[in-house]
């Protein structure tokens, strides 16, 4: 799903990675605020099994449209650290990556001892303080 924006918007983008069960309002707010500050669009990597967007993401999309912010949503069955890093590093326009927390990503990692975040070519923002992240069902 892609949204159009005003032509004045730069090619810079914020990458927002959303894992199913870890959707926190602070995550969406952090990504939106960074887009505003940087004058950037938003690429969203969404790990979600349903056919309809989660209500919080749908609300974010509506806000982005209303504000004229370009966005793109890519949906996945699962999302690993490596996937986020690879996407960010292969898209030159990504200025920063926003995730909920560093915690919990190892659960589906092939190698739990590796640290793909160390290979990220741009800043990584965690929106939820450690120890406050819990999987929601």
Predicted features along the sequence, with ranges:
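SAM-dependent methyltransferases
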Residues: 1-11, 129-137
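Small/aliphatic-rich secondary-structure junction motif
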Residues: 3-58, 65-67
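Gly/Ser-rich helix-loop-strand patches that form or flank binding pockets
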Residues: 89-137
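A glycine-rich helix N-cap at a beta->alpha junction
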Residues: 59-78
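Short, well-structured alpha-helical segments in soluble
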Residues: 61, 84-92
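Structural motif
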Residues: 17-21, 47-49, 75-76, 99-103, ...
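Short acidic active-site motifs
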Residues: 56, 79-85, 112
